[in-house]
A protein has these predicted regions:
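Charged, compositionally biased N-terminal leader segments and the immediate start
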Residues: 1-33
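Loop/helix-junction capping segments adjacent to catalytic residues or to phosphate/diphosphate-binding pockets
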Residues: 3, 140-141
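Long amphipathic alpha-helical segments
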Residues: 21-57
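Amphipathic interaction/junction segments at domain boundaries or subunit interfaces
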Residues: 47-139
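Short terminal or interdomain "cap/linker" segment that borders an active site or interface and mediates
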Residues: 113-132, 137-139, 152, 156-181
Length: 181
């Protein structure tokens, strides 16, 4: 798991729930001696253990937490990688280019050992996208949250038209992006 996600999870938890909740979550996950640095890679179980602990502390469902975090994390990530994102993009352009521009150029080139999910996006009709998430991790709801976060960042909203678990680590969403009212 890329440290940038883990570091932002800490910021998300402290922003939404407070420092004491983060301290409790980190303790329950058994990671009190680990400071997640954005440029490092960590075992996948770190995120899973933190989310499981957060679920226990908040009483919220894992999928809801992942989706909320996905939406929350997009603005800081876009700001972090702003130089790689053309200013003229909207949410559709961002999502259509996320695999090549973000996962390939930013993550895999800088960290060849990194194994981010593969996120293939294609436009089925104007402003209707099929988003296919492929990963050995069960984090597809984090990806869906990111779709919501991208839309919100660009002043748009998302309507989920379809959601299906294809097999194992593959999940497909069909979404419509619309300007926010």
């Amino acid at each position: 798991m890329h440290g940038v996600i883990l570091a932002h999870l800490r910021h998300f938890v402290t922003d939404r729930y407070g420092q004491s909740v983060w301290d409790d979550v980190n303790h329950r996950a058994g990671l009190t001696d680990c400071l997640h640095v954005p440029i490092q890679l960590y075992p996948d179980n770190h995120l899973e253990d933190l989310v499981t602990a957060l679920q226990s502390v908040t009483g919220l469902h894992r999928d809801d937490l992942l989706e909320e975090f996905g939406a929350w994390v997009i603005p800081p990530l876009i700001n972090m990688y702003r130089a790689m994102i053309p200013r003229e993009w909207d949410a559709v352009a961002f999502l259509l280019n996320v695999e090549e521009r973000i996962h390939q150029r930013v993550i895999r080139l800088k960290n060849p050992e990194a194994t981010p999910p593969r996120i293939d996006v294609r436009e089925l009709e104007p402003r209707v996208l099929q988003v296919e998430y492929r990963s050995h991790r069960d984090l597809s709801l984090l990806a869906l949250g990111c779709v919501h976060g991208v839309a919100a960042f660009y002043g748009e909203k998302v309507e989920i038209l379809e959601s299906e678990q294809v097999d194992g680590g593959v999940r497909r969403f069909v979404v419509r992006l619309e300007p926010a009212a």
